[in-house]
Amino acid sequence: MIYRHNETVSAKALSDLREAVGWNRMESEYENPLMTSYYHIAVYAKDELVGYIDCVSNGVTDAYIQDLMIHPDYQGKGVGTELMNQMIKYLKEKRIYMISVVFEENLKPFYDKFGFYPMLCGQMETFNSK
């Protein structure tokens, strides 16, 4: 496995991985130059993107882990754990002290391992349909 930090990942490779994990492709969104992250890590097996994590941040206090995707063939093999460990290490080195993540309930035990806990404040969201 090769872990690449903050190197360009093609929109097609990201979209293929999203599709493999059951998410929508978003290829045109990834091609938009405004679609950037504060930091990301990509994992490759040979030349195939098999894992990806990214976060958005103000670069000072807060970071939000936006996506953690592991190709189904590589799930349960420690790839997601390693990506989380590397991301958290990087953010701590940058002295970013509040890291948040939104996840499906069945993934709670995974995120518990990294010290995540429910926030005591309300969280709300809205979606602007096109």
What do the PLM-derived regions correspond to, one by one?
Residues 1-28, 122:
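Short amphipathic alpha-helix that is part of the acyltransferase structural core
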Residues 102, 112, 117-130:
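Conserved catalytic-core motifs of GNAT/GCN5-like acyltransferases
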Residues 91-103:
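Conserved GNAT acetyl-CoA-binding A-motif
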Residues 74, 78-86:
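Conserved acetyl-CoA pyrophosphate-binding loop and the N-cap/start of the following alpha-helix
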Residues 71, 104:
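Residue-level recognition of the GNAT/N-acetyltransferase active site
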Residues 29-40, 44-46, 51-69:
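A conserved beta-strand-loop-helix scaffold within acyl/acetyltransferase catalytic domains
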